[in-house]
């Protein structure tokens, strides 16, 4: 199937020109169907079998799995098709027009991370994929930037068990083998309103929340003291109070107070255990004020992730790149892929470009990224 694809830069241009924004706000959220159609056509042209998978619980979002080869094992290359929304007033270029300037390619998704699929396609354009000795899978997921619904659903429903996977998130080609998780909760306190001239006739939700926050801070200190992973720049689980709102007037007893908080657990800490620790921390308040305090998820939680440092994937990639793997504090889809096979996070561009105005790919990443994909496909699918 040689040379059936457009040139690399035109593939990149087409990906950036196809909007696929994910947002919790319905007015900003977009389907990724057009982008999936583009990718499905190109991978079909290369000889892959292509399956498009609707993702339940989303607004018309899809995963795409392109596969070739038979048998067990093989390699999975994966990434997400969606981008974050953009702030029109802060971009100096059209986010959906690939712009080349000063050794950079500008556009929404150039770094995070639609452009990774252009690298995969370009690396495979001259490969007869029907002759690979082990399977090669390409997965394009939906909604990573909001719920990670695509990766969650794929990992829960697929029977595939590749030998290993690489997620092409922007890491400046520094291989990542572990990251923290993310839990985002809302704590709600329901009081009883009344006139401020007689506080005893009501229940002040702000005062109850003040008590709850004291117990949450004790949990924060306990997490810091009990759990450590020295490879991380912040080597303990973090707990952050991000948003609070309560009451509506200075002369009313506050009837409702709401606190948004997050916890970033280390690899190996289970989500159930953390939820249990939070509930235990708040138990004294709940017992003192029955039925007035609740805890709920703001977003579906993401567990921490770790690829075994002695796995063949780590050894091969470290040798190819001449560098050691690292760990990071941010989250990716790796915990879900790791349930299928050992997984690394590794791709072009810097994470510092993600979610920024005038997002860009430095062209110095083009050649080494193409070479890396070619080498890992050769190692894991030809041998």
From Swiss-Prot:
Pathway(s) this gene product operates in, as recorded in its UniProt entry: Amino-acid biosynthesis; L-arginine biosynthesis; L-ornithine from N(2)-acetyl-L-ornithine (linear): step 1/1
Binding site for Zn(2+) 1: 80, 112, 169
Binding locations of Zn(2+) 2: 112, 145, 355
Keyword entries, A-Z: Amino-acid biosynthesis, Arginine biosynthesis, Cobalt, Cytoplasm, Hydrolase, Metal-binding, Zinc
Co-factor binding comment: Binds 2 Zn(2+) or Co(2+) ions per subunit.
GO biological process: L-arginine biosynthetic process
Catalyzed reactions per annotation: N(2)-acetyl-L-ornithine + H2O = L-ornithine + acetate
Pfam families, per database record: M20_dimer (PF07687), Peptidase_M20 (PF01546)
Family: Belongs to the peptidase M20A family. ArgE subfamily.
Protein name: Acetylornithine deacetylase
Species whose genome carries this gene: Salmonella typhi
């Amino acid at each position: 199937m040689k040379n059936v694809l457009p040139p690399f830069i035109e593939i990149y241009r087409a990906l950036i020109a196809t909007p696929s924004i994910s947002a919790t706000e319905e007015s900003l959220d977009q389907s990724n169907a057009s982008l999936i159609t583009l990718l499905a056509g190109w991978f079909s042209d290369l000889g892959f079998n292509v399956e498009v998978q609707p993702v339940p619980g989303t607004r018309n979002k899809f995963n795409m799995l392109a596969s070739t080869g038979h048998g067990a094992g093989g390699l999975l290359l994966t990434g997400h098709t969606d981008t974050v929304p953009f702030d029109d007033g802060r971009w100096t270029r059209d986010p959906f027009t690939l712009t080349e300037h000063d050794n950079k390619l500008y556009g929404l998704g150039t770094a995070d991370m639609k452009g990774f699929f252009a690298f995969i396609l370009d690396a495979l354009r001259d490969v007869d994929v029907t002759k690979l000795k082990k399977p090669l899978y390409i997965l394009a997921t939906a909604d990573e930037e909001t719920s990670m619904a695509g990766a969650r659903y794929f990992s829960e429903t697929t029977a595939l068990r590749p030998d290993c996977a690489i997620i092409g998130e922007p890491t400046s080609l520094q291989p990542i083998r572990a990251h923290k998780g993310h839990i985002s909760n809302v704590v709600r306190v329901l009081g009883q309103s009344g006139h401020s001239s007689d506080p005893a006739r009501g229940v002040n939700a702000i005062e109850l929340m003040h008590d709850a926050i004291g117990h949450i801070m004790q949990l924060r200190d306990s997490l810091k003291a009990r759990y450590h992973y020295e490879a991380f720049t912040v080597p303990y689980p973090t707990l952050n109070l991000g948003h609070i709102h309560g009451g509506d007037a200075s002369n009313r007893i506050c009837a409702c107070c709401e606190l948004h908080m997050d916890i970033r657990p280390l690899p190996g800490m289970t989500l159930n255990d953390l939820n249990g620790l939070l509930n235990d921390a708040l138990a004294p308040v709940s017992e003192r004020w029955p039925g007035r305090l609740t805890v709920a998820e703001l977003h579906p939680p993401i567990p921490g992730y770790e690829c075994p440092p002695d796995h063949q994937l780590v050894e091969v990639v470290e040798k190819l790149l001449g560098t050691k793997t690292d760990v990071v504090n941010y989250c990716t889809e790796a915990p879900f892929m790791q349930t299928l096979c050992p997984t690394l996070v590794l791709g072009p561009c810097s994470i510092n470009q993600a979610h920024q105005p005038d997002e860009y790919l430095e062209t110095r990443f083009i050649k080494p990224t193409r070479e890396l994909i070619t080498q890992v496909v050769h190692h894991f699918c030809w041998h």
